[in-house]
Amino acid sequence: MDLLEGLPITVKVRGNWDDCVLEALDGVYGLEDPQEIQLLRLTQYLMERLDTRYIDWLRSLPLLDKIEVDGLRFSLSHNLPDKNYGGALQVTNETSNFDHLLDEETDIAVYGHVHKQLLRYGSQGQQIINPGTIGMPYFDWESLKNHRAQYAVIEVEEGELVNIQFRKVAYDYEAELELAKEKGLPFIEMYQELRREDNYPGHNKELLTSLIKKHDYVEDVKDFLQKIKNES
């Protein structure tokens, strides 16, 4: 967070994983669902390392923000303007779904969430861009799979969109994995599969249940829930 704070970022929006952290801190989750236990344990890990002032900052972020760059009007949202979760904007969905990103005051809509780079048009001709993902790329076509971090560069000159570049950058995936191990990241087995196989088994409840039992995460989470209760 300190690194992000030092960058000249002009627009920030709140994503679904941000809300998961806030919901964990607000006592929304319990000990019955393995996915909720996972979110609680990851939030606990985060809070052991994060200045609490960033939580207030996180709560203040909007779902949608707009910015004008040299006359071109951009909207930015994690997913839909009023919903930062769900599958409405999967890249092969109908154009009518993507029209929800657009209005008469938007020339270009930028969104994230689906972990895939995309350029397409709304039904009235505005452009829609997804820059992709830094650390969790999803590929349906096996030959296109790769680990590289994704981003996009949009160039505007004198009110005109002159260039869009979708980029992928390699980094040392094993070094990143070793760093996560050194820092004691919970559910490290799942992170290892993500880094090495480009597969994140986050919806595999059987795997989650086995890892929770293996590492006794329930006891960790019980202590965390009690701490949250005491501080509320």
PLM feature spans:
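Core catalytic region of metal-dependent phosphoesterases/phosphodiesterases
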Residues: 1-49
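A general structural signal for well-ordered secondary-structure junctions
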Residues: 10, 64, 186-188
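Positions that flank functional sites
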Residues: 19-20, 116, 195
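Short aromatic-enriched loop/helix-cap "lid" or pocket-rim segments at secondary-structure transitions
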Residues: 23-28, 88, 141-142, 177-179
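Short leucine-rich amphipathic alpha-helices used at interfaces
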Residues: 26, 31-33, 59, 161, ...
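Acidic, His/Gly-enriched loop-helix segments that form or flank divalent-metal centers
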Residues: 41, 46-167
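Acidic, His/Gly-rich catalytic cores of divalent-metal-dependent hydrolytic chemistry
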Residues: 124-232
